[in-house]
Regions:
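A generic structural signal for well-ordered coil/turn residues at beta-strand boundaries
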Residues: 117-119, 133, 156-157, 166, ...
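Cytochrome P450 C-terminal beta-domain/meander region
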Residues: 131-145
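Short secondary-structure junction/hinge motifs that connect adjacent elements
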Residues: 27-49
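Residue-level signal for inorganic ion chemistry
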Residues: 20, 74, 103, 123, ...
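A short, Trp-centered hydrophobic/proline-enriched beta-strand micro-motif
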Residues: 116-128
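Internal helix-loop-helix
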Residues: 49-108, 116, 152-158
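Glycine-rich beta->alpha junctions and the first turn(s) of the following alpha-helix
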Residues: 2-8, 12, 180-222
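A short core secondary-structure module
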Residues: 124, 147-179, 184
């Protein structure tokens, strides 16, 4: 048995490495750390043009249909160059979350748009990992209210947000004025975390429960 990257995987790594090498420099990283978004917008545009956003999206929905290994190889390059790319939430966790028979309608609606770069998905699941007693999220009659912190890929006006309440996943569309998103200061200024405030926002339940939550968390950690 051969434990090595295939020729296609090596080509993928080489292509991403060359792209980030030409884009990422110390001046750009400093501007990102100071709060400028020009650099992150540039990197995300290049990712979209290379079709990387749809890496885990099935081919039938406009993506590449590749797997978590290929996603981790790209993640390695993002870390190597400290690139402020929208990746883990948008391009890894969300496709895995929606790409199953139980959520076929949501997948067909949103995954093609993630693949072509016309949609950004943020992920706010800190509620599952470390719920705060004094604040958090509640759902009543299909509407979510409350505050979720440490959301990822949510700093550039996402179109949808994947969140969790009481071991259930939900998808919230942000095309309304009932959501407030603000950036949280962290040690790594190139990797922005966000606080999201929901004001009675309509939510679509994502079927899968605790098993699916654990699955996307594992994928994000890889």
């Amino acid at each position: 048995m051969e434990f090595a990257l295939s020729e296609e995987q090596e080509l993928l790594v080489d292509s991403v490495s060359k792209m980030l090498s030409s884009s990422c420099n110390i001046d750009e990283l400093r501007s990102q750390a100071s709060g400028e978004k020009t650099f992150s917008n540039k990197v995300n545009k290049e990712f979209s043009e290379m079709g990387l956003n749809g890496l885990l999206v099935p081919e039938r929905l406009g993506g590449s249909g590749l797997g978590i290994l290929e996603a981790s190889l790209i993640g390695e390059q993002i870390g190597k160059f400290a690139a402020p790319a929208i990746w883990i939430g948008n391009s890894v966790m969300t496709p895995i979350c929606l790409n199953n028979d139980e959520n076929k309608d949501l997948a067909e609606e949103w995954l093609p748009r993630i693949a072509d770069g016309s949609c950004i998905s943020g992920v706010a699941i800190n509620e599952y990992i470390s719920k705060r007693e004094d604040n958090g999220l509640t759902i009543d009659n299909g509407e979510i209210s409350g505050i979720s912190i440490f959301a990822i890929d949510s700093e550039t006006n996402p179109d949808i947000i994947i969140t969790v309440i009481q071991d259930e996943l939900y998808l919230v569309e942000t095309a309304n004025e009932k959501i407030e998103i603000s950036n949280l200061p962290t040690i790594d200024s190139t990797r922005v975390m966000s606080e999201i405030v929901f004001h009675s926002c309509s939510a679509h339940k994502i079927n899968g429960g605790k098993d699916l939550i654990e699955k996307i968390i594992d994928a994000g950690r890889v």
